[in-house]
Every structure is written in C-alpha cells, then in structure tokens.
Amino acid sequence: AKIYESAPNRCNVIANIEGSDTSRPGLVVHGHIDVVPANAADWSVDPFAAEIRDGMIWGRGAVDMKNVDAMILAIVRKWARTGYKPPRNIVLAFFADEEAGMTFGSRWMAAEHPEVFAGCTEAISEVGGFSVTVGDGKRLYFVEAAQKGIHWMKLTANGRAGHGSMMNDENALTALSEAVAKIGRFSWPQTYTKTVKILFKKIAQATGKPYNEEDLRPLLKEIGPTARMIGATLQNSANPTMLEAGYKANVIPGSASAVIDGRFLPGYEAELNETIRSIIGPDISIETISRDIALEVDFEGDLVDAMCNAITRHDPEGIPVPYLMSGGTDNKALSELGIVGYGFSPLKLPADLDFMALFHGVDERVPISGLEFGVNVLADFLENC
C-alpha cells in the first residue's frame, strides 16, 4: 500500500491487487476514511467506541462508511492469507475528505495522481446493495446507478442602508427575504430519469400496485422511510439553508445574502439554474459556492450482472434494482477519468430499520447480521466479476 498525503493530516491510502487475468480492465474498490462529527451529548453511547448492543455496532461511521471499509479489508485479508487472486486487477482506494467535498481526497487523487487508476474502467463504493422490504416481505436491493448534481449558490440583494426608524423602499433584506420565500415554496416539476423509471416499475411489480409513468409518487409509500430519499430524486430541488444580513437592530443593511442548496437531476442542471433566476428576478445576484456533476450510468452489462448474481445467490428471493441517489459519492471524481461507478456495499437489513435516518444521524448503527451477509455477497461479487 502507498499513502498519498494531499494536505497535513489528509491521507489517501492506495493498494494494488493483481488479478489472475491482467489483460482485463481493472476495478476500483473504494471507500472514504473520514466521518462527520458527532456531539457525544446527543448519543446514548460513546460515538467513537464502536459499542456492540442489541446485535448492532454503534458509532459514528457505522453506516457511513466504516462498515464497507471493514468488509473490504476482511475480504482482502483472507485473500492475502490464502494467496487467492481475483479475476481482474483491483485498485483499493481509501480516500480522505469525502464528507468535506472530496477536495483533498478523490478529487485530488484524480487530478494529481490519475496514473493510480490507469487501466481501470469501473468502480464500486458506498450506499448501494442495501435491502428495502416491501409488500408481503419481498426484499428489493437498491444498487446506486445515478446521483444528483449539486449547485450551492449565494444570493445577494443590494439596497440602501439607513436608520432603522426611517421608511426605506430599497431594503435589501426585504428583497432577499421575498426571493428566498419564493424559492422555498416553489413546486418543482416531476422529472423521471431512466433509473427512476426502472426502480418504480420494480416497486410496482413487487407490490402489485399500479405503475403510472405520469406520476410515480403514489408508489413512494410502498418503500417506507426510504421514500424520503427517493422522493428527492423525482425532481430538481433548492432549499434555503443560510441567511446573513445586518449588524445592529436599528441599522437597515445595505446588502443581504442567503445560501441555497440546489440539487439537479442528471441532464437538468440548466433547468435548475434558469428556474432559480426566473424565481428571484434580475436584481439579485447569484454566486456559485460549490458545484458538482450529476451522474447516471446504465444498469446493465457484465459488472451489473455480477452484482445482481451475487445478491441472488445469497438471497434467492432478493430483487436487485437501480436507484438514483439524492447525494453524491467519490464516484463523481473517478467519473472524470472515464471510470463508470456504482454504489454496491451490500447489506441485508431488518424490515423495520430506518436505514437512511442513520446516515450522519444520532446513534448511528449497523446490524452485525447485515455485515455478515454483506461481506459474503461482496466477496462473491469480487471473486466473480
């Protein structure tokens, strides 16, 4: 293994595993080694103690994504001990900084050390292959095949500063507030990508509910708490998240700013930007704070077949389905190198577990039985892909 330090205390760990057929394109198997902070006072356990309770491992990173990192390491440790060679070359990549925009992790590696990934055409990583129980107990395994893009923008309204006791028809804060309220209340049109259509057809088939391509929203209730995340993938979105204006109660500020978290579907970035502009009008400026691409790849081919076959070999009643993720992963950075990525970190979950709420949540935890299932499925996949 080799360590690539992009900045002080920002390390990326890369290892190469030679396959039995080195003429085949390589596979990147990657995870991130950072986690978001945790306020210990909010937790029922020490968030960094990895306590085992009620058949689960509790702690920050248990689902995002130390669980996957641990599965990967368990598999390659077994290979090292037995001398096993996978069918193709594998690049193991453990990135820094995924939770902070990937700047010193996958983005830095792709920009500064693309040679690390030379010969690789495909990748797998987090947030995919987890089970969602629907209908009369059928399990759908959600494999990530698409991701929304990001456009964080700062809106600024300028006006006439003055004394708070005076009338002011050029109040920047008033203008900004009206614009922010319009954005927050805007009803974005439903737009369904190919990945979303495939997913909802599978949901309809598994539950026996009608499939109406004109309005997929009625099917959301069939997937329980997962609907919160999947519902966000049926349209673009823009949420006001921060406000900044003024410095004293009796001073009308000359400017006021707000931050908007915009998310766009694959192929619909222009629509997001044009809609925001039309909502707020011409007098408020827009500054890009951060932008990242959207992704969508085909849910077909040998790699997808290998993922699906690995799932059904270990859960014959399981139904692999593609889904569009409302957030993003390090696969976005690797896509800039032409690498096609999927979210495949299999977990068989209890039907009543609100899995999505655990990401960055209080009392984050992962079922040990899910990990045991996942490591077997992941090993099966890696040994047959």
What are these model-derived regions, one by one?
Residues 129-379, 383:
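Metal-dependent amide/peptide-bond hydrolase catalytic core
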Residues 57-70, 99, 170, 365-372:
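Short, conserved micro-motifs enriched in small and acidic residues
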Residues 111-129:
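A glycine-rich helix N-cap at a beta->alpha junction
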Residues 68-83, 103-111, 172-175, 182:
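Active-site-proximal alpha-helical scaffold in enzymes
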Residues 23-91:
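Active-site metal-coordination/substrate-binding segment of hydrolases
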Residues 1-24, 49-50:
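A non-catalytic alpha/beta surface segment that caps or lines the substrate-entry region
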Residues 33-35, 94-102, 126-131, 161, ...:
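Acidic, glycine-rich active-site loops and adjacent beta-strand->loop/helix elements
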Residues 87-95, 121-125, 195, 323:
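Beta-strand segments within the central parallel beta-sheet cores of soluble alpha/beta enzyme folds
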